[in-house]
């Protein structure tokens, strides 16, 4: 099981959209994929619930147990729901804001290594289902928090999402430095940075090229994904309607373009993993 986290310390850069769309394309390619929504805002959860509703002509997906309840019961399986063939969701809800308090009570500051025990808790629960999935895609809030710490600790790979604006570049650089500190701090942690994913704020704008060039200098051009996600208005609609797909729901050529884009990105991700020997 490969666990991948999409992140940046700047909000609104497309983390959720790109993580969910990658998970969707992995599922379409036959990989059993679980999306873990570690953001209490639950944007990934809402997107996938609407996708389920669109594909099944229903208002939305009914969720029985929340992730917070499942984690406190040490049984995340009870909260996992199926979206479509090969695509599953560990949904977030407003009660997930209680997760830091839950960990503080479970591992009080008087315990040895209490900080690492707290951030390792999610990984230990996720490991219980490692034989059930090929990929786990984790979405996190754009903050330095126990949510991000937990996701990174559980990850094999991290993808930094970079929107072509200066604040996003600053956030990506800060997140890169955070990853280095985290890696050095916890010897048992084991992740790598799979790449930096560029997301264009607007198409054919000169500033985009400047930001991309600066990012290449900062992170290394070999770390930048070849696939660049261009601005597509259709992605905004998905937040409201769910992901349209010609095989499963009403769609048009705009949807076909979106899926081609993310299929190409997914193929590049898989090729990078093959080169590292993580998949066949």
How would you describe each model-predicted region?
Residues 1-280:
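P-loop NTP-binding core
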């Amino acid at each position: 099981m490969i666990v991948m986290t999409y992140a940046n310390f700047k909000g609104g850069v497309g983390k959720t959209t790109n993580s969910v769309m990658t998970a969707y394309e992995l599922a379409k390619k036959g990989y059993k994929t679980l999306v873990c929504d570690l953001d209490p805002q639950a944007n990934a959860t809402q997107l996938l619930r609407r996708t389920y509703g669109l594909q099944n002509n229903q208002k939305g997906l009914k969720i029985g147990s929340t992730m917070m309840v499942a984690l406190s019961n040490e049984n995340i399986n009870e909260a996992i729901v199926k979206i479509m063939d090969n695509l599953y969701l560990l949904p977030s809800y407003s009660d997930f804001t209680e997760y830091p308090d839950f960990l503080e009570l479970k591992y009080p500051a008087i315990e040895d290594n209490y900080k690492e025990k707290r951030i390792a808790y999610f990984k230990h629960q996720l490991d219980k289902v490692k034989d059930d999935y090929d990929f786990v895609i984790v979405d996190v809030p754009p903050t330095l928090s126990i949510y991000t710490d937990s996701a990174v600790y559980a990850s094999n790979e991290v993808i930094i999402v970079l929107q072509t604006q200066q604040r996003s570049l600053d956030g990506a650089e800060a997140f890169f430095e955070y990853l280095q500190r985290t890696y050095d701090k916890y010897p048992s942690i084991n992740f790598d940075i799979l790449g930096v994913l560029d997301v264009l704020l607007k198409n054919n704008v000169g500033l985009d090229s400047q930001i991309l060039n600066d990012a290449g200098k900062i992170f290394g051009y070999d770390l930048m994904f070849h696939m660049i996600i261009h601005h597509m208005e259709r992605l905004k609609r998905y937040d409201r309607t769910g992901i349209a797909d010609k095989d499963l729901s009403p769609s048009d050529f705009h949807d076909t373009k979106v899926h081609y884009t993310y299929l190409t990105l997914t193929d590049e991700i898989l090729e990078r993993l093959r080169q590292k020997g993580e998949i066949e």
